[in-house]
Amino acid sequence: PHPSGLGSALTHPSITTDYSEALLEFITPVSASIAETERALQNLHLYTVRQLDGELLWNASMPCIVHGDAGIPIAQFGTSNVGQMKRIYRNGLSVRYGRKMQAIAGIHYNFSLHGSFWAEANKLAGNLKSTQALQTDGYLALIRNFFSRVWLLMYLIGASPAVCASFVQGNPSHPLSLIHI
């Protein structure tokens, strides 16, 4: 279960649970620098480790030994309506993709450019449209460029270098199940 020392997985502003009870999610505040974000993340890690009573945090994106679906408990968020909706959503993911797929960890990030950047960019572009319109167009162009190269980005930085054999056990159609060590 979610360690009680970490507070409620449903309401804590910085520490929650992703899909499984064992898959913690850290939420850093908005910051203006990488160093500030790294400090916040370091503080969250230190606080969490102190609450885990000797349990270790797994730092790889792929889970270690997986003992079937029973070894991946779906996160509990309490009995409130919001908590129940989160549970129902995760049950649906379990049915659709399987619990093992939900145990893969990853980094989610949001970023934005400061408003002064867009104002200056609009001036340089000759103020042909509103700053808000330029900002919207700029972010949409960024997304288009990302998606045009997503295959390469995922190949270079999204692929895990190792996967435990237990992760593909029982799935003969998985390409990794063909490898026998």
Residues covered by each model-derived region:
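Internal, well-ordered domain-core segments that constitute the primary functional module
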Residues: 88-174
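Terminal catalytic/cofactor-binding subdomain
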Residues: 1-94, 101-103, 134, 138-144, ...
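Conserved small/polar residues in nucleotide/adenosyl-binding loops
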Residues: 179-181
